[in-house]
Amino acid sequence: MGRLHCTQDPVPEAVRGDMQQLNQLGAQQFSDLTEVLFHFLTEPKEVERFLAQLSEFATSNQISLGPLKSIMKSLLLVPNGALKKGLTAEQVRTDLQTLGLSEEKATYFSEKWKQNASTLAQWAMGQTLMVNQLIDMEWRFGVTSGSSELEKVGSIFLQLKLVVKKGKQTENLYMELTLPQFYSFLHEMERVRASMECLS
């Protein structure tokens, strides 16, 4: 198997078999399945709808749901990697063919990729920016009163509590900084704020 653009990791052997299964689908079946996959890629939080659509596809095409899920997992390998690495439609097509998908189906998929590229890129960018949104920050100054190192006694430190939003949940992160580290951190935060104001 040639090198893939979407991942450096070794690809499970089952992926090749899944691609062969995809090759056996008719053009309309592959088109319908691709439609389901792109719905999921553009709205990945809709897992239940995705599974319902897969189940419906399996029933209407007399395919077992278990193998179909495996096929979709293998097919998702390329677009997921492509989103992370910003691959072109041509690179997506090449990767699918390298994994064993027929040229006709790989070309069809890459055309769909091209049509949805801007929506997918915006979603991926939004995810990247929203992953660790800082909601609140608290800090307290302290003075070291006892330490095994004599020169550290009397030194000022700072305890930070960051409230970070990860998806729909918030998480508290704690850290302790020396005064020079804190001023360096503050300086970086000011630079980030200035950059954000320039962009808005």
From Swiss-Prot:
GO terms for cellular component: cytoplasmic vesicle. It is found in: Cytoplasmic vesicle. Keywords: Cytoplasmic vesicle, Transcription, Transcription regulation, Ubl conjugation pathway. InterPro entries: COMM (IPR017920), COMMD4/6/7/8 (IPR047155), COMMD7 (IPR037358). Residues 133-200 form the COMM domain. The lineage of its organism: Eukaryota, Metazoa, Chordata, Craniata, Vertebrata. One of its GO terms (biological process) is negative regulation of DNA-templated transcription. The gene is Commd7. The keyword Membrane does not apply. Belongs to the COMM domain-containing protein 7 family. PANTHER family: COMM DOMAIN-CONTAINING PROTEIN 4-8 FAMILY MEMBER (PTHR16231), COMM DOMAIN-CONTAINING PROTEIN 7 (PTHR16231:SF2). One of its GO terms (molecular function) is NF-kappaB binding. This is COMM domain-containing protein 7. CDD domains: Commd7. Scaffold protein in the commander complex that is essential for endosomal recycling of transmembrane cargos; the commander complex is composed of the CCC subcomplex and the retriever subcomplex. May modulate activity of cullin-RING E3 ubiquitin ligase (CRL) complexes. Associates with the NF-kappa-B complex and suppresses its transcriptional activity.
